[in-house]
Structures are given as structure tokens and as C-alpha cells.
Regions:
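C-terminal flanking helix
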Residues: 21, 25, 46, 124, ...
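Internal acidic/polar
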Residues: 84-113, 140, 183-185
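Helix-turn-helix DNA-binding module
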Residues: 36, 117-154, 168
Length: 185
């Protein structure tokens, strides 16, 4: 698709956009917590694809490059607005997808969702981005390092400290039972 887009094939660019727009949008939304901003970032990302199409190495997968652009645009938006990462409802939904069998279980799951969301919100920006890319987007450490343009050791460190901070916050949350909290360790 990249080669065809380079040749001016608009349908190829449209196919490229349709293939990756959901992933780019979800990542931007998880970082910026604002639907309008996520939509703007999505558009800006694909404008960059179109304007830099000649610089993109078509022998490499496009998605890590797209995520790098998405994360950078999202980071710039957050920095300009002095906002923190937040929603991550997708992560929380993935963590609590078991069917509810009782009202008590439903209440416990709602409490767990709130506790996880608050714990994730309290992490610093760098740890949150790494956790989003690792758990929500399923990228490897090497891919995250490429996307963020940092050494793999930095990604491992942020992932380690992000998990540790998340675990500490969840274990210290009085709303969670010990049994539920230990599931996060």
C-alpha cells in the first residue's frame, strides 16, 4: 500500500487509513482522554504519513512508525494542555471481562474497575504510555523502544516501575480484598 500511495494512488492511501485508523485512534484516546483531541491526532498522524510517505521504509512494518507518530503527537497535546493520561476503559474492560454471575460480583467488579482506573491515572506519563503500549496495544519491549525512541532498558525500567507502582497502589487500596489485590501481583 505504501508503494502504491507513493505513486499517487489515493485508494491505496484510503485503504491504509482504514486499516490502521482504529489502532491509532484508540492509542491516542487512551493517552489524551479527549475524543476530539484523539480524532485530531488521528488526522494529524495520517497527514504525516501522506507528507512523509517517501521517507517511510516500505520493507519495515508501518505500525511501529504509526505508533511513534501517534505517541509523539499525543505527548505534545498532553504537554501543551498540561493534562494527564487517563481513561483506559479498554484496559479496564480487558481486565474484567468475566461474565457477572451475581449482584455482589457486579459490585466487586465495579470497585475493581474504579480502583484500577485510579491507580493507572496516578502513574507518571512515561509509565502510563509504556503500560498502554505493552498491555493495550500488545507491543514488545523492542517495538515500544522504537516507538518511543528510547533504549530497551528504559522501556523495561518504565514497565517494571509502572507495574510495581500499580501493584503497590492496588495492594494499598482498602476497597479491594486481599484475594483480588493479589491477582495483580
Amino acid at each position: 500500500m505504501i508503494a502504491r500511495t507513493r505513486q499517487g494512488d489515493y485508494a491505496a492511501f484510503e485503504a491504509l487509513y482504514n486499516k490502521y485508523k482504529g489502532q491509532v485512534y484508540r492509542t491516542a484516546l487512551a493517552i489524551v482522554r479527549d475524543q476530539g483531541a484523539a480524532e485530531d491526532i488521528l488526522q494529524d498522524c495520517f497527514i504525516k504519513v501522506y507528507t512523509h510517505i517517501d521517507r517511510i521504509d516500505s520493507s519495515l512494518p508501518l505500525i511501529p512508525w504509526l505508533y511513534r507518530v501517534t505517541v509523539n503527537l499525543s505527548y505534545n497535546w498532553v504537554t501543551r494542555r498540561k493534562r494527564w493520561l487517563t481513561p483506559l476503559e479498554n484496559v479496564i474492560d480487558r481486565l474484567t471481562t468475566a461474565p457477572r454471575t451475581s449482584p455482589e460480583q457486579a459490585v466487586e467488579e465495579d470497585e475493581l474497575q474504579r480502583a484500577v482506573q485510579e491507580a493507572i491515572y496516578s502513574l507518571n506519563f512515561e509509565q502510563r504510555v509504556v503500560l498502554i503500549l505493552f498491555y493495550l496495544s500488545n507491543f514488545s519491549i523492542r517495538e515500544i523502544a522504537y516507538i518511543l525512541d528510547v533504549p530497551e532498558g528504559t522501556v523495561k525500567s518504565r514497565l517494571h516501575y509502572g507495574r510495581a507502582n500499580l501493584r503497590q497502589k492496588l495492594l494499598g487500596d482498602r476497597r479491594l480484598s486481599i484475594g483480588v489485590a493479589y491477582e495483580w501481583s
